[in-house]
């Protein structure tokens, strides 16, 4: 079988497990899209704009482990770069592929459309290098296989996005055939000496410490170490807490799990348990202003074992080339029981999170009642995509059955991320019950991608909280800029359905102003398997979780610190 640059790329994407790639057409990528379509083992999924295309791919990567997005040059790629920055921050291997001008024009110094009006066309590649783990431009078919393999292998190894630029007159040119897929997955093993030393130093560090706690961080999935973390926790016997962005990365029904560790907004008893611990073994954590509640919840470095995806720092010694999965597996085989932290937590009798009792069905709808009814929908096969804002805190409060997942974008924190991410996730995992929790302000940024849920008949259940503004910004710093124009959100579903058109959809838009109306709307949503259901939930502007208020004040205080005289 003969290959072109485009079909080579398609085959490599299929070989790494992709069944879909996301795309927005533009004249510099049309021939490439044609070539990708020739591979019948992968479907081309279309998005409404390039920002959404990037976020859709990011959501797909959460479900499938990797993703690809195809856009046009400059006017497309520069929009997608926002989402690629998010994929970098969230440790997700998204392959961004951009069409590019004909290399004859590039060589001749012609001024072209969709560009800056200059004759240097390297600027997009140079920009991409700052937000990806690898970036390559293909100007000849001979160099295509090596460059394609390089970026894909880098994405899979580093769990970071990569960038590939293909000149429009190169996509259909013949090139070499792809070899075995195994070459793309090869990764350097842990250095045995460094691994053994890290394990022995850790055992020595905790030998005389009984109250040992485990803190699960948001890079645990990227490290491929979720199962290893459970085995280690079971062997250790200590308390296990998750950082906010790592919710669902450790099974909440595990007997060692004590809840979310998030400073002042932690689960009851968790903050005190973590502070009283003799040692904290942090697994792939991210300590930023959000995760530390405005820098108020940072572990004591004298008690900390910092286990990153590829290195371990313990007792002031850094052990490189140690894979987290290998480290935890080896520790689980050698560690002695250390139950002190879990015993201490139990002695506090801190109780469970206070949950709202069922509301009067005729009473005006409130935030707590929405969260209660959403939590009742959770099964081991459910994924909740929680938008930046109070949806974070509502999802944090939910008790997850084993197998349920929650997805956040807490490092990048781009409002509007959740809508295309939920679309992409549902494309990648259509067998799951996919729930989207999003506020009205965030929804307005990326609402168009609901139309693609309609197009592909994806039964995503969307809980849209209509409280007339950016609530998370209100809690951090209020002003008139946090007020938004109200929409008829439920009414949008008729727009997206395009009733009467050649591809009329089956999306449903419903409104809920009471708990009873919400319960009835959920029944309709569960019965609608032919498209998304958007439930517009009306609540008061000041109605939010107590946790958001506390957290917002801490983050606001961190933002308002006096300036320093010197930057790093």
Swiss-Prot record:
SUPFAM superfamilies: DHS-like NAD/FAD-binding domain, Thiamin diphosphate-binding fold (THDP-binding). GO terms for biological process: aromatic amino acid family catabolic process to alcohol via Ehrlich pathway. The keyword Metal-binding applies. This is Pyruvate decarboxylase. Keywords: Decarboxylase, Lyase, Magnesium, Metal-binding, Thiamine pyrophosphate. Homotetramer. Binds 1 Mg(2+) per subunit. It comes from Zymomonas mobilis subsp. mobilis (strain ATCC 31821 / ZM4 / CP4). The keyword Magnesium applies. Thiamine diphosphate binds at residue 50. One of its GO terms (cellular component) is cytosol.
């Amino acid at each position: 079988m003969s290959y072109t640059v485009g079909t080579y790329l398609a085959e490599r994407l299929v070989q790494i497990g992709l069944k879909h790639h996301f795309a927005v057409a533009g004249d510099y990528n049309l021939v490439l899209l044609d070539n990708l379509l020739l591979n019948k083992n992968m479907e081309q999924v279309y998005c409404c704009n390039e920002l959404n295309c990037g976020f859709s791919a990011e959501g797909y990567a959460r479900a499938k482990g990797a993703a690809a997005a195809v856009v046009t040059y400059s006017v497309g790629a520069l929009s997608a770069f926002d989402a690629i920055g998010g994929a970098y921050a969230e440790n997700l291997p998204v392959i961004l592929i951009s069409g590019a001008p004909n290399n004859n024009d590039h060589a001749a110094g012609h001024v072209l459309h969709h560009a800056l009006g200059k004759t240097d066309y390297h600027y997009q590649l140079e920009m991409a290098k700052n937000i990806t783990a690898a970036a390559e431009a293909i100007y000849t078919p001979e160099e295509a296989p090596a460059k394609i393999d390089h970026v894909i292998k880098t994405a899979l190894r580093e769990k970071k996005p990569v960038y590939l630029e293909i000149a429009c007159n190169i996509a259909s040119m013949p090139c070499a055939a792809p070899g075995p897929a195994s070459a793309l997955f090869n990764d350097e093993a842990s250095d045995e000496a460094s691994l053994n030393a890290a394990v022995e130093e850790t055992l020595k560090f905790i030998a005389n410490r009984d109250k040992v706690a485990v803190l699960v961080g948001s890079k645990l999935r990227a490290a491929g170490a979720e199962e290893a973390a459970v085995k280690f926790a079971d062997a250790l016997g200590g308390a296990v807490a998750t950082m906010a962005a790592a919710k669902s990365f450790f099974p909440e029904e595990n007997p060692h799990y004590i809840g979310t560790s998030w400073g002042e907004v932690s689960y009851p008893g968790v903050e005190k348990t973590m502070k009283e611990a003799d040692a904290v073994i942090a697994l792939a954590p991210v300590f930023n202003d959000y995760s530390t509640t405005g820098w108020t919840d940072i572990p004591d470095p004298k008690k900390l074992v910092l286990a990153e995806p590829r290195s371990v720092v313990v007792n002031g010694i850094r052990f490189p080339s140690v894979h987290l999965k290998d480290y935890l597996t080896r520790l689980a085989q050698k560690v002695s029981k250390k139950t002190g932290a879990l015993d201490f937590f139990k002695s506090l009798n801190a109780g469970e999170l206070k949950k709202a009792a069922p509301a009067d069905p005729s009473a005006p709808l409130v935030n707590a009642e929405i969260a209660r009814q959403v939590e009742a929908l959770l099964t081991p096969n459910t994924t909740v995509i929680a938008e930046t804002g109070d949806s974070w805190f509502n999802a944090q409060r939910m008790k997850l059955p084993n197998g349920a997942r929650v997805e956040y974008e807490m490092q990048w924190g781009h409002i509007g991320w959740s809508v295309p991410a939920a679309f992409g996730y549902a494309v990648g995992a259509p067998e799951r019950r996919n729930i989207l929790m999003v506020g009205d302000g965030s929804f307005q940024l990326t609402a168009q991608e609901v139309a693609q849920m309609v197009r592909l008949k994806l039964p995503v259940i969307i809980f849209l909280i209509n409280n007339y503004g950016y609530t998370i910004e209100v809690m951090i710093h209020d002003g008139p800029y946090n007020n938004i124009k109200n929409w008829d959100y439920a009414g949008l579903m008729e727009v997206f359905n395009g009733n009467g058109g050649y591809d009329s959809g089956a999306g449903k838009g419903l409104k809920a102003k009471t708990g009873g109306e919400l319960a009835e709307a959920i029944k309709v949503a569960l019965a609608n398997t032919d498209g998304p259901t958007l439930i517009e939930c009306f609540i008061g502007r000041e109605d939010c979780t107590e946790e958001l208020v506390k957290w917002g004040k801490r983050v606001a205080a961190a933002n308002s610190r006096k300036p320093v005289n010197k930057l790093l």
